[in-house]
Structures are given as C-alpha cells and as structure tokens.
C-alpha cells in the first residue's frame, strides 16, 4: 500500500529549511547504507544526530503523530529518527531493499523497518529526475511529490531514486515499526477504519457501527505486537 500524505510543511517553512540545508556540511550517503545498498547509493546525507536533521525530524514526527491518516495507515510503534539527504546532478540510488532492522545511533533499541517514508523538501519544478520508483503488486510507481508532501510505503518494497539531471533534490526519510508487521493486515485495518469513519459521518446512529468498530479492535488485538 502506497499512501500520499500532503501538506506537512508550508511554503515559508520549506523555504527556511532549504536555506539551512544549502549551508549545511554534507557527508557521503553510503555511511548509513548496508553492504549491498552502498554499492548503489550515490548521494549526500546529513550525519546521523546532526542538529538540523534532529530539528526537521522532530517537527516532522510531531506532525505525523497528529495526522489521523498516517496514524491509521501506519499504526506506529517505534520510529527511526528521520535522516536528511541531498541528490545533486548525477546523484542517484539504484534498486535496493532497506535493511530489515535499524539501530539509532547511541540507542540500545532496534527498529524493524515495516514502513518507509519519504518527505519531499524540494519543489518538483526545481529539479529534473529524482523520482522515487517503488515496485509493488501493481508494477512500478514513480513518485515525485510537491514539497512538504510525504509518501508512505512498505519497507519490503524494491525501490530506487532516479538520477537527478538538473538542480538539487532534498528529502527527509525514515522508517516505522508498526504495531502490525504484515502489510496486508495493516491495509485491511486501514480500509476498515476509513469505512467506520465515513459511516460515522453519514449514519452516526446506525447500530452496526458498534459491531464494526468492535471487529476492528478485535482484529487489531489479534495482530498487534507491543
């Protein structure tokens, strides 16, 4: 399941973020890649724990925790702190699958990468190329969103970033360990939750709503890992 979550940052915030990123000291993106992924990774990245990355990441997570669509789809349990990357002309990241487990720097806890997220920070007209290409059950999906928009997709997906041929592509990315590890089960719960919310708006007093809501929570109780 691919999910588009729009408008997490406004134009003024994004302009300030990009101005700060233009002045930042970048490191080789291979530093946070696994052995196989490093062979395909050609980009720049703010070092893990960088003050600017922490500031952007904290604001992003705070907004997502208040976003009903994200919470319903991801059912988050743990999050790997967001990282920030930069693709300049020629930068790309070939097809790869993210490592199954991530351990934040300085933390004893590991995060299972059930879900991957990318927040686009550059206006799509400001660079050519740089599409996020995700392979799913419906074939290849090319994603190039407006600045401030996020895409959420299964961590099991084969994906790549096409070469940037003009301009600079800034983005934030992170991984979520869900309460429900199986994508098909999360998708079913997301659809059911959406249906419950729509029915609540349309027929708020319908007696079947109580039963349907109970079924949702019983499925979540069966599948959740805490």
Swiss-Prot record:
Keywords linked to the UniProt accession: Dioxygenase, Iron, Metal-binding, Oxidoreductase, Vitamin C
Domain Fe2OG dioxygenase, first and last residues per copy: 78-178
Positions of Fe cation binding: 96, 98, 159
NCBIfam families: PRK05467.1-3, PRK05467.1-4
Essential cofactor(s): Fe(2+); L-ascorbate
GO biological process, one term: DNA damage response
EC category name: oxidoreductase
UniProt-listed InterPro entries: Oxoglu/Fe-dep_dioxygenase_dom, PKHD_C, PKHD_hydroxylase, Pro_4_hyd_alph, Pro_4_hyd_alph_FE2OG_OXY
UniProt name for this protein: PKHD-type hydroxylase PputW619_4316
UniProt EC number: 1.14.11.-
A GO molecular-function descriptor: iron ion binding
Residues annotated to bind 2-oxoglutarate: 169
């Amino acid at each position: 399941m691919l999910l588009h979550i729009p408008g997490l940052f406004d134009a003024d915030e994004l302009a300030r973020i990009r101005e700060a990123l233009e002045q930042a000291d970048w490191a080789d993106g291979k530093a946070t890649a696994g052995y196989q992924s490093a062979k395909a990774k050609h980009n720049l990245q703010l070092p893990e724990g960088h003050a600017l990355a922490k500031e952007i990441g904290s604001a992003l997570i705070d907004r997502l925790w208040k976003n009903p669509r994200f919470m319903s789809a991801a059912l988050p349990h743990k999050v790997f702190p967001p990282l920030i990357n930069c693709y300049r002309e020629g930068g790309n990241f070939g097809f790869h699958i993210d490592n199954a487990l991530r351990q934040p720097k300085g933390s004893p806890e590991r995060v299972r990468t059930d879900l991957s997220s990318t927040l686009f920070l550059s206006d799509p007209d400001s660079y050519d190329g740089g599409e996020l290409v995700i392979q799913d059950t419906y074939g290849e999906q090319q994603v190039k969103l407006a600045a401030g928009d996020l895409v959420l997709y299964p961590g099991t997906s084969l994906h790549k970033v096409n070469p940037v041929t003009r301009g600079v592509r800034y983005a934030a990315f992170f991984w979520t360990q869900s309460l429900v590890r199986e994508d098909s089960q999360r998708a079913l719960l997301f659809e059911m939750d959406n249906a419950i919310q729509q029915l609540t708006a349309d027929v708020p007093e319908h007696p079947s709503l109580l039963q349907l809501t109970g079924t949702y929570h019983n499925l979540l109780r069966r599948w959740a890992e805490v």
